[in-house]
Amino acid sequence: MVTSMLPAGLVASAVVSASSANLGPGFDSIGLALSLIDEITVETTDSGLVVQVEGEGADQVPLGPEHLVVRAVECGLRAVGVRAAGLVVRCRNAIPHSRGLGSSAAAVVGGLAAANGLVAQANCQPLSDAALIQLSSEFEGHPDNAAAAVFGGAIVSWIDRGGQHPRYAAAPLRLHPDIHLYCAIPQERSLTAETRVLLPAQVSHEDARFNVSRAALLVVALTERPDLLMAATEDVLHQPQRAPAMPASAEYLRLLRRHNVAATLSGAGPSLIALTTASALPPEVMEYGAANGFTLAEMTAGEGVRWSPGVTVVG
């Protein structure tokens, strides 16, 4: 592929949602976008790289070429066959980092989408949603958060390993309108790579059967039968194994479920996601969270990633 140079002075922006993966049994496959957003603005320049970050993670992320958004922007440009001599990348983050809310997927999807906004000004064909999912999942290693960030709402995703390279794909689900979403976000952090090593390399047929049945039921519960959410969010493959690494979240999870709230770890934790048809959580649940350092927030399903040439103002 012949690579052409983008002119200096192009500006593009993207708005991308947080996401919760797994939702109990849907390990590495089911995801749900949430109404927390990161905003990204990218400008082409004659040379150099400037990265500016405000909000979540501002004092923790690298401000150079290794920044995830920078890597994703460059990946998106490369995929289309263009490059930029220099970039200014500005990130305004509301998605907490290392809490199981898809901050890395949002950074990658947002960076790729911002690249779309640049290439659209150079008479190039922007990346399709399928390409956004493929490229962002290659960064992540699994498509659940990435696909939720691309499509918005609830999704089911899968990996096809039949070819030379894994192919990642997803299909959107129509989330039932009676489902209310809550996130419980602790101060403590957890890295997916650190908790993934707690999972066994092999599982029993009994446990596999259990999770397959619950994952199938979860699709039904999310779309048609929210009264089945408690049973549909049961899991034996990853949450019990991760619990010792995050005792406060594990205890809060048990409390929520004792009060008939369909709660799970959000991704690898330590945040929790709760799905309920009730208009509010039980008072005991609210009080426990506040007393134990959790920020409890009602959410709605997040939108799919949005990109545009120029700067998008979020209302």
From Swiss-Prot:
**Domain of life, source organism:** Bacteria
What chemistry does it catalyse, as a reaction equation? L-homoserine + ATP = O-phospho-L-homoserine + ADP + H(+)
Example of a GO cellular component annotation carried by this entry: cytoplasm
Disulfide cysteine pairs (residue numbers): none
Q: Is Membrane tagged as a keyword?
A: no
**Coiled coil where?**
none
Any idea what this protein is called? Homoserine kinase
Species the sequence originates in:
Mycolicibacterium paratuberculosis (strain ATCC BAA-968 / K-10)
